[in-house]
Swiss-Prot record:
InterPro entries: Ankyrin_rpt, Ankyrin_rpt-contain_sf, Multifunctional_ANK_Repeat, PRANC_domain. ANK repeats lie at residues 31-64, 101-131, 135-166, 199-231, 235-266, 277-311, 334-368, 458-487, 491-521. Signal peptide: none annotated. Substrate-specific adapter of SKP1-containing E3 ubiquitin-protein ligases which mediate the ubiquitination and subsequent proteasomal degradation of host target proteins. Prevents activation and subsequent nuclear localization of NF-kappa-B in infected cells, by targeting NF-kappa-B RELA subunit to the SCF E3 ligase complex. PROSITE patterns: ANK_REP_REGION (PS50297), ANK_REPEAT (PS50088). It holds the Pfam family Ank_2. Belongs to the orthopoxvirus OPG023 family. It comes from the Viruses. Residues 586-666 are annotated as: PRANC/F-box-like. GO terms for biological process: symbiont-mediated perturbation of host cell cycle progression; symbiont-mediated perturbation of host ubiquitin-like protein modification; symbiont-mediated suppression of host NF-kappaB cascade. This is Ankyrin repeat domain-containing protein OPG023. Keywords: ANK repeat, Host-virus interaction, Inhibition of host NF-kappa-B by virus, Modulation of host cell cycle by virus, Modulation of host E3 ubiquitin ligases by virus, Modulation of host ubiquitin pathway by virus, Repeat, Ubl conjugation pathway.
Length: 668
């Protein structure tokens, strides 16, 4: 009988005959099934009268087989494509609905004939809708993933214990935190986001006639029950970001899914692919879009609700591979939006001039804001800078950017990857090749700068910034271009004080001292030195320079410094006084060494006994550079003398007096 019930088309008369001498509750078979189990496992069980007959014959509707399933559980767990409502009702009524939670709601939802009246019966008799399936999805989550969920049934589920608002819905993620801490070690955190995410993702593509695409009524239903469309899943995606991958996109559904999203052009970098992602970015990227062609009406909707930075980030990565689409999008923008996008592009992206040209063609302009933005771009290059300045006219470099000198942004530490400090400079020569991109860019800007000593809101010049950020080649360029070493900032800081206190760079300090700051500037700098012990070498450099200007400076030096460096000051005085006493050809040794005029004529006295004696004594301990200056003068003199002697006797120069010939060759 059991084989007959399980495998054949059951006839009532034949079954009645079998039941006369067979026990329907005989469960000695290997599966511990009773007669109801056997019939309800039959793929052809569609006759409610058979079920009634078995029940009338005393078959126990609450007996559990080897799988711990009652007949109702076996019926709703089996391979049936459809669950017969009448059979389910008979099994429920036979137990007074005590077996109601044996009903497998998850299997039933996958059947092709979900009956709202049967769902209402389950609701009415206390079915536990908080139950979850093996994959830890709730009833409502499973239902929205079925082929064609019905809003009315969704309402029933939600109104009777199926929550769509997770306990952590207020945070940025739409998935339940508690589920990540299941005691089941095999359980993996789900990645599904909200119920709305699940519904959208499971209905992106119409795989068969029976499976519908996304239904706007279902979307409205879920949103009306409190699901926030702006919630994101673990991949940082909203439901809309998935929906735009759909094979059929309804713009009205897009508008529904946009609720709560204040920027449809927001973007982010995907950790796995390193691609720019986001709603608009994904839609424009053919790798994520189902349809080949872009719907411009949809793009316009995203543009209207997107912010310039996100729009820029969404279109720029696709420019090289899809110029046609991007240019079409640029063409649809109004000039104000396009102008904002141009400024964002110039400020934050690696510039492609061909894209800039398209933006200009469609109404954007390279203005002061655009130039100021480019100075903040960490991907700056001299070629693009030259192009932009030519387009704008170059006047933007002369206007402060929110109180800051525009070019000054290039001095900051975020450009530290570029080598301002070159080997050429280490060897004692100024780096004038401008191989560094930032240095080259500044060199391009300088001709447009009307006042190289323009000050920012703090009273600082470009030179202050270059010194502060330890940009030696840039300091050299600015000094060569006329930057004033003596300018004090609003707080009284000089470039010299910054070099000592902040940069702690002796080479920078020596560069500044070589450009002859005033005595007041040096004294003010000494007053600003914060640590007179650790900065001993720098302080001595300032003292030795200041005493060349005024040997009575000791009374002007801050008392704390003069006391600490009194012996050093005395030695400086001794060496300078000695140079002032030595007369060489009507000039003091001091004037030949430390004045501009002396530097031009010292080589003429290379053979002077007083100069030679002083040179050979090597007595200085502080002003030792004097000997290098004299040595260079002797070399120059010998070269001039050699050139004079090599003159052909048959030339007119050979007949000139030696002093005249000397003056001629010293100009070479």
């Amino acid at each position: 009988m059991f084989d007959y019930l399980e495998n054949e088309e059951v006839a009532l008369d034949e079954l009645k005959q079998m039941l006369r001498d067979r026990d329907p509750n005989d469960t000695r078979n290997q599966f511990k099934n009773n007669a109801l189990h056997a019939y309800l496992f039959n793929e052809h069980c569609n006759n409610v009268e058979v079920v009634k007959l078995l029940l009338d014959s005393g078959t126990n509707p609450l007996h559990k087989n080897w799988r711990q399933l009652t007949p109702l559980g076996e019926y709703t767990n089996s391979r049936h494509g459809k669950v017969n409502k009448d059979i389910a009702m008979v099994l429920l009524e036979a137990t007074g609905y005590s077996n109601i939670n044996d009903f497998n709601i998850f299997t039933y939802m996958k059947s092709k004939n979900v009956d709202i009246d049967l769902i209402k019966v389950l609701v009415e008799h206390g079915f536990d809708f908080s139950v979850k399936c093996e994959k830890h999805h709730s009833v409502i989550e499973n239902y929205v993933m079925t082929d064609d969920p019905v809003p009315e049934i969704i309402d029933l589920f939600i109104e009777n214990g199926c929550s769509v608002i997770y306990e952590d819905e207020d945070d940025e993620y739409g998935y339940a935190y508690e589920e990540y801490h299941s005691q089941n070690d095999d359980y993996q955190p789900r990645n599904c986001g909200t119920v709305l995410h699940l519904y959208i993702i499971s209905h992106l593509y119409s795989e068969s006639d029976s499976r519908s695409c996304v239904n706007p009524e279902v979307v409205k239903c879920l949103i009306n029950h409190g699901i926030n469309p702006s919630s994101i899943d673990k991949n940082y995606c909203t439901a809309l970001q998935y929906y735009i991958k759909s094979s059929h996109i309804d713009i009205d559904i897009v508008k529904l899914l946009m609720k709560g999203i204040d920027n449809t052009a927001y973007s982010y970098i995907d950790d796995l692919t390193c691609c720019t992602r986001g709603i608009m970015a994904d839609y424009l990227n053919s790798d994520y879009r189902y349809n080949k062609d872009v719907d411009l009406d949809l793009v316009k909707l995203f543009l209207e609700n997107g912010k310039p930075h996100g729009i820029m980030c969404s279109i720029v990565p696709l420019w090289r591979n899809d110029k046609e689409t991007i240019s079409l999008i640029l063409k649809t923008m109004n000039s104000d939006v396009l102008q904002h996008i141009l400024i964002e592009y110039i400020t934050f992206s690696d510039i492609d001039i061909s894209l800039v040209e398209y933006m200009l063609e469609y109404g954007a302009v390279v203005n002061k804001e655009a130039i100021h933005g480019y100075f903040k771009n960490i991907n700056i290059d001299s070629y693009t800078m030259k192009y932009l300045l030519k387009k704008e006219g170059g006047d933007a470099v002369n206007h402060l950017d929110d109180g800051e000198i525009p070019i000054g942004h290039l001095c900051k530490s975020n450009y530290g990857r570029y080598n301002f400090y070159t080997d050429t400079y280490r060897q004692g020569f100024r780096d004038m090749s401008y191989a560094c991109p930032i240095l080259s860019t500044i060199n391009i800007c300088l001709p447009y700068l009307k006042d190289i000593n323009m000050i920012d809101k703090r009273g600082e010049t470009l030179l202050h910034k270059a010194v502060r950020y330890n940009k030696q080649s840039l300091v050299s360029l600015l000094l060569e271009s006329g930057s004033d070493v003596n300018i004090r900032s609003n707080n009284g800081y000089t470039c010299i004080a910054i070099a000592i206190n902040e940069s702690r760079n002796i080479e920078l300090l020596n560069m500044l001292l070589c450009h002859k700051p005033t005595l007041d500037c040096v004294i003010d700098s000494l007053r600003e030195i914060s640590n007179i012990v650790d900065n001993a070498y720098a302080i001595k450099q300032c003292i030795r320079y200041a005493m060349i200007i005024d040997d009575c400076i000791s009374s002007k030096i801050p008392e704390s410094i003069s006391k600490h460096y009194n012996d050093y000051i005395d030695i400086c005085n001794q060496e300078l006084n000695e140079m002032k006493k030595i007369i060489v050809g009507g000039n003091t040794m001091f004037s030949l060494i430390f004045t501009d005029h002396g530097a031009k004529i010292i080589h003429r006295y290379a053979n002077n006994p007083e100069l030679r004696a002083y040179y050979e004594s090597k007595q200085n301990k502080i002003y030792v550079e004097v000997y290098d200056i004299i040595s260079n003068a002797i070399v120059k003199h010998n070269k001039i003398h050699k050139n004079i002697e090599s003159v052909d006797d048959n030339t007119y120069i050979s007949n000139l007096p030696y002093t005249i010939k000397y003056k001629i060759f010293e100009q070479q």
